Amino acid sequence: MFIYYCKECFVMNKQQSKVRYSIRKVSIGILSISIGMFLALGMSNKAYADEIDKSKDFTRGYEQNVFAKSELNANKNTTKDKIKNEAVVKTSDTSLKLDNKSAISNGNEINQDMKISNTPKNSNQGNNLVVNNNEPTKEIKIANLEAQNSNQKKVNKGTNNYFGYYSFREAPKTQIYTVKKGDTLSAIALKYKTTVSNIQNTNNIANPNLIFIGQKLKVPMTPLVEPKPKTVPSNNKSNSNNSTLNYLKTLENRGWDFDGSYGWQCFDLVNVYWNHLYGHGLKGYGAKDIPYANNFNSEAKIYHNTPTFKAEPGDLVVFSGRFGGGYGHTAIVLNGDYDGKLMKFQSLDQNWNNGGWRKAEVAHKVVHNYENDMIFIRPFKKA
């Protein structure tokens, strides 16, 4: 009985032990689960904290990036203003110069996203100007350059090494010309290679035909063409001209009537001269007919007046029918360039003032303008 009781007790103890063991296992399991959940929760919190930190870092980086971009844009504008302030622009003569002795041509534009580079320099190309705003230091350097421009060139002024530009389109320089006796605006304009209207506008002259001796005029600073050295005439030509002039002096201040009719006519004086050369007078109803009524093949050469023609002493000059009441006029040349401009000549005339028919006007010197319809007859023989 005792044994049975003990056995039963043993069985009960064993069962209780199993129950306690089971409870302990359950407790351990619950504890393990709790610890695991706690650890898992801690790791989750840590991961969440890490995510929050990363999010804060991202937000901070984004704000810094936005700030950096705004600062970069501000630096770009500042840089552009700096470049504009450092560049001195001369609008006149379309020229530019830089304070650091750098020149930028008008056609070059400074871009924001450019890079400084030193391009090898050759005869046709200078250094390139490039700017980089993406450099860490945000500094802009301008290289020395020579801008290529076909209408401009480099200038050195005195001892100062100045690099700039000037336009070839400069205002014409002028000089002062004093009006002299016999001057005209057209002659002055021709002398200084300009126009009458230009001289009028420069000097505020209303009437181009009215200028005064001693008047000061502004004329272009044109280098005057030096006169060509005059060729020394041969002794024979000089002697012949002298002999002709000496003979013509004997005709001066006297009245001549070669044909005995109508007093001292212009035709009479010329016939006296031609008879002295060739032993006969000239034919013609009027003075204007002389070139056409006579055969000059063996005695003279006929010239029609041109702007460059110069008469010689001893030449006959024949005026057209516009003179002498339709009969024309004739005279003997003494000086073919009386005014030094081939505009006037001097001759020995008779009856120029219509006093010959009364024998009241002797042969005398007269200065004439070259007329476009004049004819000159140059004898081969000299007096």
Swiss-Prot record:
GO biological process: cell wall organization
Listed PROSITE patterns: CHAP, LYSM
Chief localization: secreted
Span of domain LysM: 175-219
Residues making up the signal peptide according to the UniProt record: 1-49
Enzyme Commission number(s) from the entry: 3.-.-.-
Pfam families (alphabetical): CHAP (PF05257), LysM (PF01476)
InterPro entries referenced in this protein's UniProt entry, alphabetically: CHAP_dom, LysM_dom, LysM_dom_sf, Papain-like_cys_pep_sf, YSIRK_signal_dom
Residues passing through the membrane, by range: none
Subcellular localization, as worded in the UniProt entry: Secreted
Name of this chain's protein: Probable cell wall hydrolase LytN
GN (gene name): lytN
